[in-house]
Amino acid sequence: MLIQNTIFYKKEWRWSNFIKLLISQLAKYHCLEHEIPSAFSYKESTYGSSKSQNNVSLFTWGATHRERINFARAVCINSPSYSVLNFLIIPSTRFNIPFLGVDFVSLPKNHLLVLDFQPSLKVENQFNSELLDQLVKLKKSCHKSLPIAEKMSEEVSRFFSPGLIWSRLPKHKNSDYLIENQLYHSFKEYLVLYLNTLFTSEEVDQGLQQEIINGQNNYLNYRRNKDPARPMLSSLFGKDFTESLINKVLFSTNKVYN
């Protein structure tokens, strides 16, 4: 099944313009779509009480690039109560580049919005001053419109950069406007900057590459063990499917290989 033939490419899904932009930008760099195992590529389920059941659908989309991207994947969820776009680029460890992490989650009462160049090493060892300045400038511009959410714990914050966009919005029309305009604009800026940085970077030596491999594995292992989406996914799709999805697709260290 092609994602273009699903609800996730239609305006009824909140994040459709975002996923379209992701796929089109990756195509510009000649990334190839990666076939996701059928057990995880598309799934439908129901949730809620027997008297008030809702339908929910999930689509997992993937891509690779033979030189620059080990694995890029998007998890899309659509239901009356939950709407999710979770996206991660795992860059090749031959380049000293952070992850691109996107987590846009609409819950029954709130929107949780996370966008960042997520470091796999200490920030000072992965970001030069020019990139960091660009990122912080884009972040500040975004947060002129979007409120900054509560401070993250130290355990979690180590996996984010000073350029983190992190916001919590209530569900109302003004939030819809902010998502469709300011958030989309910032998302495009981050995506374009990230891909340009990734595809113009130079290869590292073997010593630094091993540090990057270790750093990527550290992040992926943390997310496998403590993914905050686990309770929501389990309630929508069941524990067995959720554990397999998290361990085999979303945060598998098997994708960290070059």
UniProtKB/Swiss-Prot annotation:
Instruction: Name the chemical reaction catalysed here.
Output: (3Z)-phycoerythrobilin + oxidized 2[4Fe-4S]-[ferredoxin] = 15,16-dihydrobiliverdin + reduced 2[4Fe-4S]-[ferredoxin] + 2 H(+)
**GO BP, sorted A to Z:** phytochromobilin biosynthetic process
Please give one Pfam family short name: Fe_bilin_red
UniProt entry tagged with the keyword Oxidoreductase:
yes
What parts of the sequence cross the membrane? none
Q: What class of enzyme is it?
A: oxidoreductase
Keyword set, alphabetical order: Oxidoreductase
Question: What's this protein's family per the entry?
Answer: Belongs to the HY2 family.
Q: What is this protein called?
A: Phycoerythrobilin:ferredoxin oxidoreductase
Could you tell me which species this protein originates from?
Answer: Prochlorococcus marinus (strain MIT 9515)
Taxonomic lineage of the native organism: Bacteria, Bacillati, Cyanobacteriota, Cyanophyceae, Synechococcales
